[in-house]
Amino acid sequence: VERSRGLGDVYKRQLLLSAIISDTLMFRSPTCTPLDKSVAEALAVIAEVDIETYAKNMFQAGSNFSGKTTEEIFYQDFKIFHTDDCDFGVAQISAMSREELDKVAEQIRPFMVQVLAEKKIDMVYVMLTDILEESSKIIFDGENAGKILGAAFRKEERSEGILLEGIVSRKKQFIPTLMNEMAERQ
């Protein structure tokens, strides 16, 4: 925060605040540290914004999918992972409501088959993360993708997707659990 005081204008402080809020999903992600929260609170005071209102407006703007192509929505946060036996991709799409995410899921499902072929991966998962409910519905495609997901999170495999309550971080929650299950299958 001390370094941000020298930045000189509210815009730069709001930008730093936005980065922290986005990275920590409004402090709901397990990646959030006490330092993240204290720095964000200090930046909010300096930038003269109410942090809750600012975060809500920021996420609502970020989850406005109108005018975006399926490809733009899908690839805005997509990463490929490798194990000894397979390559798989995970996209994460966040919004403020399950309804928004359900609409996006309908749009994305047919595109996932194309992603498998274009990226030459075995499986693809999409985390549809509801920020306010602190949960992710996972939709998937590829051979054994649903079986692996269900086994990893001790959930029944469902073709329409699997709801994982409390799972919002791809890095700290989703990928380690999924990769552990894949390692057990080797």
Regions found by a protein language model. Name each.
Residues 12-19:
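Alpha-helical scaffolds flanking conserved acidic
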